[in-house]
């Protein structure tokens, strides 16, 4: 997944670098929409890569799962059952599968990684709305609202997935700790 993200970002950058001068020269409305859409999508990909890198440098997958932020809330289990998370979670891609691989990592490390991944996606959700502030300067409200909102929803799925998996992992970790 990491290679696909980086490759997609490179292609978006090339597309933006090609479409922007064409729009500047022609002023064509269709090229403008294409340029704005590519530019905003490029922003979303670059921002994701940057947020993930920065949070990883700061946290190193060592978040405190006992923090109130990461603890399971009373409503969550019912909410996840309503969303049927168990049925679709296996189809969601992982940016860095080795981070969650039980043959390479301890359960405690994986729990820390779920906390960190949650933070990454929550920050991304907020930053996904930032392009909306550029609408008065760029126009393209429909394209910007659409890409920003869809981006936020996509990251909400990843937050849900981390929060869904963590309580089970914590229980496994606590059982291992009791055996020691």
Language-model segments: what does each one mean?
Residues 1-37, 109, 160-173, 180:
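Cytosolic-side membrane-entry/anchor segment at the start of a transmembrane helix
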Residues 12-18, 38, 42, 88, ...:
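Hydrophobic alpha-helical transmembrane segments of multi-pass integral membrane proteins
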Residues 25-30, 135-143:
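Transmembrane helix interruption/hinge and helix-loop junction motifs
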Residues 26-78, 155-159:
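Hydrophobic alpha-helical membrane-embedded segments
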Residues 32-41, 131, 143-152:
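Hydrophobic core segments of alpha-helical transmembrane domains in multi-pass membrane proteins
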Residues 53-110, 167, 171, 175-180:
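Membrane-proximal soluble regions of multi-pass membrane proteins
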Residues 109-139:
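Transmembrane alpha-helical segments and their cytosolic interface motifs
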Residues 138-180:
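Hydrophobic secondary-structure block in the mid-to-C-terminal portion of proteins
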């Amino acid at each position: 997944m990491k290679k696909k993200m980086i490759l997609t970002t490179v292609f978006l950058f090339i597309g933006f670098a090609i479409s922007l001068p064409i729009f500047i020269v022609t002023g064509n409305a269709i090229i403008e929409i294409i340029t704005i859409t590519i530019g905003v999508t490029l922003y979303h990909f670059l921002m994701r890569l940057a947020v993930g890198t920065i949070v990883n440098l700061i946290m190193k997958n060592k978040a405190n799962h006992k923090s109130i932020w990461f603890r399971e809330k009373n409503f969550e289990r019912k909410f996840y059952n309503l969303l049927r998370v168990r049925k679709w979670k296996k189809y969601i891609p992982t940016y860095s599968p080795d981070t969650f691989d039980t043959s390479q990592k301890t359960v405690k490390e994986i729990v820390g990684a779920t906390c960190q991944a949650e933070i990454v996606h929550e920050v991304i959700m907020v930053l996904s709305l930032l392009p909306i502030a550029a609408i008065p300067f760029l126009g393209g409200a429909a394209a910007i609202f659409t890409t920003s909102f869809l981006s936020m929803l996509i990251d909400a799925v990843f937050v849900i997935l981390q929060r869904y998996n963590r309580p089970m992992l914590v229980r496994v970790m606590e059982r291992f700790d009791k055996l020691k």
